[in-house]
A protein has these predicted regions:
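Glycine-/small-residue-rich beta->alpha transition segments that form the dinucleotide
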Residues: 62
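Nucleotide phosphate-binding/pyrophosphate-handling subdomain across enzymes
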Residues: 10, 108-173
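Hydrophobic "anchor" residues on beta-strands that sit immediately upstream
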Residues: 19, 55, 164-168
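ATP-dependent carboxylate-amine ligase catalytic core
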Residues: 1-45, 52, 59, 118-125, ...
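Structural signal for conserved beta-strand scaffold positions within catalytic alpha/beta enzyme cores
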Residues: 22, 58, 80-83, 158, ...
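Extended acidic/charged loop-beta regions that coordinate divalent cations
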Residues: 2-28, 65-111, 152-153
Length: 173
């Protein structure tokens, strides 16, 4: 993880990624960085550290990333957006059942069944889908991987108790 400005730069100088992703800009690092714009600037260090001709995916619904991105050198990198109106997007309502969520993605021909709960999990799956396709995985393999995903315990874990379900999302609470 990252807690301060410069940490990602240091890490990418040690191991330069071929592929990098920023899924969201939250408030987890506010005490060290000041605000969401500063968090986006620190997280975008990963783009600067990504190898030449590398792949960078970002959540186009983040106004902070949208603000920082034009200030960065993206030449010689493939930059792909995901989210509403992005290069990779959800093209249907997200449906829920006891197994998880189901949604359509604009770069797949078949609906995605994801063993996870929460609309944000569909959003998190989008860059994974794109990366898998970029690595030439077959659609069937991608869909099977998402359908058989095993989530960390206590992270949107559905527990059956008698005639009811409890959604346990208490990880690090």
């Amino acid at each position: 993880g990252m807690e301060n400005k410069g940490e990602i730069t240091q890490l990418t100088s040690i191991a330069q990624p071929d592929i990098s992703v920023i899924t969201s800009i939250g408030s987890a690092h506010m005490e060290n960085l000041g605000g969401k714009l500063q968090i986006a600037q620190a997280k975008c260090e990963i783009l600067e550290g990504t190898k030449e001709n590398g792949l960078f995916l970002y959540n186009c619904e983040s106004k902070e990333i949208q603000e920082v991105l034009p200030t960065l050198d993206t030449e010689n990198k493939k930059v792909v957006s995901f989210g509403q109106g992005g290069d990779v997007s959800i093209t249907s309502d997200i449906e829920y059942d006891k197994e998880g969520i189901v949604f359509n993605c604009n770069i797949l021909d078949t609906p995605v069944h994801l063993r996870a709960f929460g609309d944000f999990q569909a959003m998190n799956a989008l860059p994974c889908i794109y990366i898998a396709k970029a690595c030439h995985l077959k659609e069937e393999s991608i869909l099977n991987g998402l359908k058989n995903l095993e989530m960390t315990k206590m992270r949107t874990q559905l527990i059956s108790v008698k005639n009811a379900y409890i959604l346990d999302d208490t990880y690090k609470s």
